[in-house]
Amino acid sequence: MPLRRITTLALALSATAATLTALPGAAAARTSETLRWKPCAEEQRQPAETPKDAQDAKGGEGAEVPELPPLECATLDVPLDYADPGGRQIEIAVSRLASEKPERRRGVLLTNPGGPGIGGLGYPAILAASGLPQEVRDAYDLIGFDPRGVGRSTPVSCGLTQEQQDRGNFPTWAHTPGDVVREAEGAREIAERCAASPSAPLLPHIGTADVARDMDRIRAALGEERVSYLGASYGTQLGTAYASLFPGRGDRIVLDSNLGPGGYDHRAMRMLARGLEDRFPDFAAYVAAHPEYGLGTTPRQVRATYQELARRLEREPVQGWDGTSFRGVTFDRLYVDANMPELAKIWQALDTGGPVPEQPPFPDVEPFMSARFAVICDDSPWPRTIREYQRDVRVDSRRYPLLGGSTANIGPCASWPRSWVKEPVRVDDQGPSNVLLVQNERDPGTPLAGAKALRRAFGDRAVLVTADQGGHGVYPFGVNGCANDAVTTYLTTGQRPARDLACAAEPAE
């Protein structure tokens, strides 16, 4: 598998968009269907369905996957188009890890690991096997699901070519205005292929608002008046959408590693570059403290090595690695502290010409990439002109020199069919005060700035807990006991911090 594919697709799994239609929220609750549970097949609960960072958060690259508890599975029919609830129906795959303590059970906890384009059917098992406190497992039935368009729910496919799949969500670095023009050609071809695909009738209807309405259908099918929620990364935007569309049906809402109130929009894509700037000093300090890598003895020298290696690989790739894949793997590995030694070895090999550590293969990613493009592009209007992206590249290359010339470059959303694009939902302070935001301060995939913006948008509905840590994902995979305890306390007792809470740094175990 080409190295660019590995790194760009890993990046595509990172930050994750909520532009929501203005259909009445109540429309999603009218269902008398119940879920018929049966044991999930083994492959339905595998960790491949969850983000790489969630799998590796405890042990880093090559960590042993814990034994997973068995799940129950069911399917739920929902309208393809909620504006036409009696029209075509599609299937949503749902899973359950039931509480084993009925006397302590207080409800259901709907979960989502992020994305978009990633299934969450196996996520309850991953949470349980990765340290979710027993008191939370006792208090809730853990509910997972594959969002529409993904996995074992009704899927979508644009029929992307291998080259289009390899592009991932990570455009090449644009050094000149002409580079943006060239990138636009490939991006437009992806949008056109999606519009001409057999999945075209489904693609306008798999955005975040549609998934949020599916979540309310799941709630109703479970027979619950209200549902609690735990969502990470892009899952925070699903939770934001649900809390905004159905404010009276949310119980305890926990959003971990937060996108801003605009979700995975054009601004969020550009903010990935800020995320790397926030996170990179942690890695630079690690490398500088380990002179055996030969990559610099001060953080400033390590940063200079990054820039020099990226330029060199763009001129002359090494073992299939170019500047784009080098930047991508750096971004990806910095999701988890435990990956820093492996990343330093990759840098060292690329610098010296030694063998690069073998990278794990990815499964078939065409459905993932198709669903990802569709959700992101459906969810909000993106700039349509090449000139706007040329301007953004010029600005971000200077502002965020580690990654800005890539993340500001043009993508398929610039050419997405206009009739498919929705307007975002309004996120405001109207509703119950039942949202807990939790966020690492130096998160590359969902930077702290997004969490602060979402906190402002929610007003008194939300409290923000920050952890003086680096990496993507806090609960329950992270090491910060203060932040983890705040989430567990809220889920089990309903008590949030009285005001925004800043948790001090804690060392990795």
State where each predicted segment sits.
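Glycine-rich nucleophile elbow surrounding the catalytic serine of serine-hydrolase chemistry
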Residues: 119, 212-213, 231-243
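Alpha/beta-hydrolase fold nucleophile elbow
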Residues: 222-234
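Alpha/beta-hydrolase fold active-site neighborhood
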Residues: 28, 300-433, 479
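Catalytic histidine-centered segment of alpha/beta-hydrolase-like enzymes
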Residues: 464, 470-481
